[in-house]
């Protein structure tokens, strides 16, 4: 796959390289102004209105604002049995838990995938963000793997999910550089555990409140090409499969940046923490400012953190 797409521009690798150089460039010389909430909203609104293009860089904080929380009440609602039996405290750590058998491990993952990939987010933050940039020349690059941008109506051809997708499996056989849609399997595995659909078609706990923590052995997912085991298509190490869709999205992102050099581009970074890979992945933004003055400050504008205005009410105030 890498050889097949070697001639395409790789926005992912370019971004990492530029990000590292940008960190070195700005080290010790970067200051951030402090704006009031109203000032920040007003400034963002102005930049959105005047920008010729917008690049949205999003990390887990955006999905958290949308209600896709991995701990607390939501976790206990769907994983209370796993918490009680294994002492798991949240969905994130549960993904690394050494379950006793494959039937239990895949029961966990069926729930994890379903409630973070195949159901609407509790709050319409993604939809509000889409409405906020409606009609603008926009591209999204994100480390989120929950598919929420697409669910909210963002253009699939202008999305780059750098770290994978909960909706995809990959083979453990490193020779197979493909991914496989898992929706049908997830629905079967949820039914096998005893979850029932409500009036909206969403799986919920049955009236008795008890479900199985295992799936049948025959339902353990296998690679359709060679029958090998599968795993999640999530970037955990160098075994992560960058498939055809990944390479095309990477090229589309790189081309979008090149097409808009010298233009007034708003780089909107939302929910991004300093300890996540997205800090480097999303950083064609900062090196562009360092390397090319046409991007900043005369033409471009970079908003680093919008955690104060990522809920629906405040996003609507920008519209």
Task: Describe the residue ranges of each PLM region.
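Conserved catalytic alpha/beta core of Sir2/sirtuin-type deacylases, generalized to analogous enzyme cores
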Residues: 1-319
């Amino acid at each position: 796959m890498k050889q097949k797409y070697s001639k395409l521009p790789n926005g992912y690798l370019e971004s990492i390289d530029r990000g590292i150089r940008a960190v070195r460039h700005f080290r010790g010389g970067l200051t951030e102004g402090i704006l009031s909430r109203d000032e920040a909203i007003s400034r963002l609104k102005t930049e959105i209105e005047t920008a010729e293009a917008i690049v949205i860089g999003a990390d887990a904080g955006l999905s958290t604002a949308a209600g896709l929380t991995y701990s607390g009440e939501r976790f206990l609602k769907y994983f209370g049995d796993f918490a009680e039996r294994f002492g798991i405290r949240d969905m994130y750590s549960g993904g690394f838990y050494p379950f006793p058998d494959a039937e239990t491990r895949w029961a966990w993952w069926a729930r994890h995938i379903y409630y973070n990939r195949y159901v609407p987010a509790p709050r319409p933050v993604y939809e509000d963000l889409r409405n906020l940039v409606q009609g603008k020349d926009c591209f999204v690059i994100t480390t989120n793997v929950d598919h929420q941008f697409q669910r909210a109506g963002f253009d699939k051809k202008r999305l780059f999910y750098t770290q994978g997708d909960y909706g995809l499996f990959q083979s453990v056989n490193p020779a197979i550089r493909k991914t496989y849609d898992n929706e049908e399997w997830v629905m079967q595995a949820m039914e096998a555990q005893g979850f029932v659909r409500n009036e909206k078609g969403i799986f919920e706990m049955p009236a008795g409140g008890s479900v199985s923590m295992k799936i049948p052995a025959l339902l353990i997912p296998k690679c359709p090409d060679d029958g090998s085991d599968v795993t999640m298509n999530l970037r955990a190490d160098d075994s992560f499969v960058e498939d055809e869709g990944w390479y095309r999205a990477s090229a589309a992102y790189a081309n979008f940046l090149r097409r808009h050099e010298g233009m007034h581009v708003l780089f909107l970074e939302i929910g991004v923490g300093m300890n996540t890979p997205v800090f480097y992945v999303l950083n064609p933004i900062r090196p562009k400012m360092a390397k090319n003055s046409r991007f900043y400050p005369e033409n471009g504008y970079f908003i680093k953190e919008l955690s104060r205005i990522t809920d629906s009410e405040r996003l609507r105030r920008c519209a």
